[in-house]
A protein has these predicted regions:
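Short adenine-binding "F-helix/F-box" segment of the Bergerat
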Residues: 236
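Broad phosphate/nucleotide-binding scaffolds in NTP-utilizing and phosphate-metabolizing enzymes
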Residues: 1-196, 201, 214-221, 225-233, ...
Length: 363
């Protein structure tokens, strides 16, 4: 959406927001039926109160507000009945498309990437796994000056209950935030993306404006941990090294490093110009102390990619996407796109030096 011209972007953005807000809600009867099956028929005893009217739509469910028996305000996320079967049908379709994708990039390990995405999507269907992810993040960031993760109160396969948060959604900041709000929000988002792999051993995998909100004290609250990228050893140092070599235009070491990581297939002859053009949008923001992410800049990157479409098709046959990095790289791309929507200034160079393993290492 950030790459769409602004005259079209605003109605497009409003339509997406309306689509998410106006998703047909479950009736109270169906909500109670899900809670009966997931928390037991005496689930009402766990709540001091429960609002049958949903306050928000989630990716495959809806969120209700309630008060737990101990007086805490809670958010109750309930999975839509049948959402798991529908999503699994989509995954089967994705698996069948693997052969088509292989034709576009015949040397790449497409199957491994698709398997990784399917595995992560399957995990999103079990809210107990989401609850475990959120517990890990909440523990790792407890007392952190920049982030707040709500605690889990209870969970079941299709229901998760967590502490309620009041804050300003990132989507609202995108719409009408002040310059200071935009800059702080974008900075926090990059910090979380870069910091979590080493701190938690995971990366928040659903970089969406509806999953982040800013609190009055400047902390960013993070919700929805259904999609995470497991990185038990953090980001591979080779990734930071690759970015640094590209920044320094040290192509003698860059190309072998990319081949060693798995981005370039062994034996392929890729020119320096091709690699430089491909990595330009990732290197440009760290050439300056503070970078201005904007829709105009992102549209320029998209236009450049369109101009190089024939060249990119050729490169797709020479390059590969390591399966273990499929989701992390998607998250980083989403972080960039959201920052462009925020129209924010981010000290991404300093954060890269501090938080991306391998970037600051001697070459």
């Amino acid at each position: 959406e950030a790459a769409i011209p602004e005259e079209f972007g605003e109605p497009y953005r409003e339509a997406l927001t309306k689509l998410q807000k106006d998703a047909p809600p479950l009736s109270a009867e169906k909500v109670h039926r899900v809670l009966d099956g997931q928390l037991g028929t005496k689930w009402r005893e766990r709540f001091a109160s429960f609002d049958d009217t949903p306050v928000a739509a989630a990716s495959i469910g809806q969120v209700h507000k309630g008060v737990w028996s101990d007086g805490r305000e809670v958010a109750v996320k309930i999975q839509y009945p049948g959402a798991d079967e529908a999503l699994r049908a989509d995954l089967k379709t994705m698996r069948r498309m693997t052969s088509v994708l292989k034709q576009l990039a015949p040397g790449a390990d497409v199957q491994a990437v698709v398997d990784e995405l399917i595995e992560r999507t399957e995990m999103e269907l079990d809210y107990r796994l989401e609850a475990n992810n959120q517990r890990a993040f909440a523990k790792a960031y407890e007392g952190h000056p920049h982030f707040f993760i709500p605690r889990i109160v209870g969970s079941a396969p299709k229901v998760v209950v967590s502490e309620w948060i009041d804050g300003k959604l990132m989507s609202a900041i995108i719409r009408d935030g002040t310059p200071d709000e935009r800059d702080l929000c974008g900075t926090r988002l990059f910090e979380l993306t870069f910091d979590a792999p080493a701190r938690v051993g995971m990366m928040h995998g659903d970089a969406h404006p509806g999953n982040f909100m800013m609190l009055p004290d400047g902390r960013m609250a993070v919700i929805d941990f259904g999609a995470v990228a497991p990185l038990p050893d953090g980001l591979p140092p080779e990734v930071g090294r690759m970015i640094r070599l590209a920044l320094d235009k040290n192509y003698d070491q860059l190309l072998p490093t990319m081949e060693r990581i798995g981005f370039i297939q062994k034996g392929e002859d890729i020119s320096v110009e091709e690699v430089d053009a491909m990595l330009r949008q990732y290197v440009e923001p760290i050439e300056v102390p503070v970078f201005h992410y904007s829709r105009r800049w992102l549209r320029k990157q998209a236009a450049n990619n369109m101009e190089r479409s024939a060249e990119q098709i050729k490169m797709a046959r020479q390059m590969n996407l390591p399966a273990s990095l499929a989701i992390p790289l998607r998250v980083i791309a989403s972080t960039v796109a959201i920052s462009a929507q925020l129209d924010c200034h981010v000290p991404v160079r300093a954060m890269t030096e501090e938080l991306i393993p391998g970037f600051a290492d001697p070459v």
